[in-house]
């Protein structure tokens, strides 16, 4: 199970959603959500709301894959 610092580091490296963090860290989603809420309250991370088609990394302009492609790591 992941700790608070592992969640913070994984978020910094991957910039992914809570569900993806939960899966990659093998930690229950409610616990990951609670950790993200705690990190937000501490000012260590900032919640960014994105629409469904938005790129998580902001690298879509340079991404060789079409936007929304299954293998694209940025879309």
Curated annotation (Swiss-Prot):
GO terms assigned for molecular function: DNA binding; iron ion binding; iron-sulfur cluster binding
Coiled coil spans: none
SUPFAM superfamilies tied to this protein: Winged helix' DNA-binding domain (SSF46785)
Superkingdom per UniProt: Bacteria
Short name of any one Pfam family annotated for the protein: FeoC
Residues holding iron-sulfur cluster: 55, 60, 63, 72
Keywords from the named record: DNA-binding, Iron, Iron-sulfur, Metal-binding, Repressor, Transcription, Transcription regulation
Family the UniProt entry places it in: Belongs to the FeoC family.
Described purpose of this protein according to its UniProt entry: May function as a transcriptional regulator that controls feoABC expression.
Name of this protein: Probable [Fe-S]-dependent transcriptional repressor
Lineage, highest ranks first: Bacteria, Pseudomonadati, Pseudomonadota, Gammaproteobacteria, Enterobacterales
Gene that encodes the chain: feoC
């Amino acid at each position: 199970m992941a700790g608070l610092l592992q969640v913070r580091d994984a978020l910094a490296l991957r910039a992914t959603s809570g569900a993806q963090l939960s899966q990659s860290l093998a930690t229950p989603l409610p616990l990951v959500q609670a950790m993200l809420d705690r990190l937000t309250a501490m000012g260590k991370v900032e919640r960014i709301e994105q629409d469904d088609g938005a790129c998580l990394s902001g690298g879509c302009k340079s991404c060789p894959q079409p936007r929304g492609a299954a293998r694209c790591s940025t879309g």
